[in-house]
Amino acid sequence: MQMYSNGAEIYPPNFQNIISIVMSASEEYLTYTAVTISSILRHGSKECHFDLIVLHQQCFSQEGINLLQQVTNLWNNCTLRLLCVNRKMEAYYVSGHVATETYVRLLLPELLPNYDKVIYLDSDLVVLRDISELWFLPVDRDIMLAGVADLDVIGQYCGTEFSMRYYINHILKLSQPEKYIQAGVLCFF
């Protein structure tokens, strides 16, 4: 495992069939992050090398670092790196009710300029299939970001939930609210 501080340049590791996956976590979420990583590796193709990058704002405890190492040490086809982003996040306004880990995914092109493609995953989900299926999906190269429609939000917008309609129309000012995406699984190109 490697640890990087603010502003460090990170390059993809020198392996064949690399799949780069980024998560953002706090100390309180490391147990969930370990489960997410374990599920990626358990179901992932043994032919691929998983380049796992965990973004964080506060230093993790040694116990938390040991937990992540225990999980990744079970597999020989992964690299784990921790990237501190606290200085980068200081420059941005963050709403009080939303964790900064939610916002950091939007900075991935800036944080990882040496990457052509990364998958961003929330650090509290379980991957039940080989994530290489998502990695190798053909995508139009004019696209910067791919995500899945957030059917719950779209349903609220189209239904009787006035506050959601107001939020999307007047706060977010989305011109196509039916294309609102869920941000827990994203592909950046």
Regions found by a protein language model. Give the residues of each.
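Glycosyltransferase catalytic domains, chiefly GT-A lineage
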Residues: 1-189
